[in-house]
């Protein structure tokens, strides 16, 4: 049994997952798996479960995610960071939606972002930290960092 748990932990770490894995149901367009992953791991997790990393390409979709996130008990903390499906991995400074290949046109960047700090920030996350007046804004961060994420029905 201990060996099985160890092997599961090793396999999960190889694809960038930690914590318990929960699938999303079809009751909502968006969901927040109880999984922590890097950006690639988050995209893979959503895809393997028939979803995609969230494409927030309109104010309406952004508001839907904000409203749903505010109902998640785990997010009633001082700081929440969630991966979404945008990055500039293909071309620096040109943010695209990974799941669709379309350019990011709608955005809700924090003032002064994206900034590609130190040349390593290529993936986008939603950031909620009311003490810093950050209210579900976007920020570019290092893709290898671990955080929860938002999946969307594909």
From Swiss-Prot:
C-type lectin domain ranges (all copies): 27-152
Signal peptide interval: 1-20
PROSITE patterns: C_TYPE_LECTIN_2
Any one annotated GO CC term: extracellular region
Tissues/organs with expression: Female salivary gland (at protein level). Not detected in female carcass without salivary glands (at protein level). Not detected in male tissues (at protein level).
Phenotype when the gene is knocked out: (Microbial infection) RNAi-mediated knockdown results in increased expression of dengue virus type 2 envelope protein E in mosquito tissues at 7, 10 and 14 days post-infection via thoracic injection of the virus. Increased titers of dengue virus type 2 in salivary glands of infected mosquitoes at 7, 10 and 14 days post-infection. Increased transmission efficiency of dengue virus type 2 by mosquitoes, measured as a proportion of mosquitoes with positive infectious saliva among the total mosquitoes tested.
GO MF, one annotated term: carbohydrate binding
First-listed, main subcellular location of the protein, grouped into a coarse class: secreted
Keyword set, alphabetical order: Disulfide bond, Lectin, Secreted, Signal
Pfam (any one): Lectin_C
Superkingdom per UniProt: Eukaryota
SUPFAM superfamilies associated with the record: C-type lectin-like
Subcellular localization(s) per the UniProt record: Secreted
Keyword Signal carried by entry: yes
Disulfide bonds: 46-151, 123-143
Secreted recorded as keyword: yes
Subunit-structure text: (Microbial infection) Interacts with non-structural protein 1 of dengue virus type 2. Interacts with envelope protein E of dengue virus type 2.
Function per UniProt: Putative lectin. May have a regulatory role in mosquito immunity. Probably suppresses replication of dengue virus type 2 in mosquito salivary glands.
Name the UniProt record assigns to this protein: C-type lectin 16
Species assigned in the record: Aedes aegypti
Lineage: Eukaryota, Metazoa, Ecdysozoa, Arthropoda, Hexapoda
């Amino acid at each position: 049994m201990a060996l099985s748990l160890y092997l599961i932990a090793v396999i999960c770490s190889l694809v960038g997952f930690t914590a318990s894995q929960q699938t999303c149901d079809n009751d909502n367009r968006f969901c927040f798996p109880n999984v922590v992953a890097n950006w690639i791991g988050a995209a893979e997790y959503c895809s393997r479960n028939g979803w995609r990393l969230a494409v927030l390409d309109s104010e309406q979709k952004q508001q839907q995610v904000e409203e749903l996130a505010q109902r998640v008990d785990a997010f009633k903390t001082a700081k929440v960071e969630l991966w979404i499906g945008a990055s500039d991995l293909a071309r620096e400074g040109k943010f695209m939606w990974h799941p669709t290949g379309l350019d990011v046109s709608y955005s809700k960047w924090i003032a002064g972002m994206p900034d590609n700090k130190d040349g390593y920030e290529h993936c986008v996350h939603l950031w909620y930290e009311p003490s810093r007046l950050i209210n579900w804004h976007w920020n570019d961060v290092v893709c290898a960092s671990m955080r929860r994420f938002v999946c969307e029905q594909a």
